[in-house]
């Protein structure tokens, strides 16, 4: 067997050296390959391996790749990002509306929005709770948060900026459950993870809520539960806030200089979806919803590796989804320095290896889905795009606009 490859084209034949040379000349005359070129002799096994290698698809979900505040004009200054800028410039781009990570993931895995995006019943299983016959109700996330006053606003901080141990979560939820046991026994907090608490509703009308990621570092007064049952849930929001403020644990945290766990954010309610669908065979990432969705649809899941080269050693026929959310927390809390440093790390450990893999034809397709406060953009890059010299490399600031 002989194989001639140029760009995205292959020429396969079988025969003698002379027949290979004649086939190559014919392909050159027809414009299939560029001259000078030589045939490469391969075995059947080589050919099979090469065809699989070239079929690998990789999809990166990258929230906050672009800095959300356009007024900070110097945010990209002196950032050396040749690989990232090369990928963004060579790829075809499609623009879309603003979507949070949770909404994007649910939609990608075929999950329709209910009253809320049904994050709670999906992450429940990943956090170790099997939904049994008795609790097929409406599940709601009730996550511990820290509220603080800044410039006459009550701002919310999530568990990315404070630490809460399993023992602390157990102590706080026990105190809350003891309080509600008589007045409202349906409100029972389940701390399956220190930073992720749950409630199962049977009779109380559920609220309409905002995703926790929509509220981080924002004033909460305009983002409280809404809809027909908003009065009930705003009352619960205030009541739990007062109860948590009185807890001895918070006095200890205050004395130690740790942020108080002084409120709960209700969000992500719904019933368990009937079905899940996905083209991905492998999901990589530390985001709990991505992990839970992979679990629910039967795809493999792995923690996010330190660098992209790890993916090169996986099955070449896989379709991979990688959730790169290093930048989201930094952007949400306006940490410009931390965001820039994280972007430098992504360039070194992810974008440089991926740029090389695409250029060498080791990836059939690389897609970057960038989620941002000004809108979302999809950049699709194929191996052949690297030869499109007319697509000149532009700085990241151009792609961010």
Show where each model-derived region lies:
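Short aromatic-glycine-(Arg/Gly/Cys) micro-motifs in beta-strand/loop hairpins
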Residues: 1-7
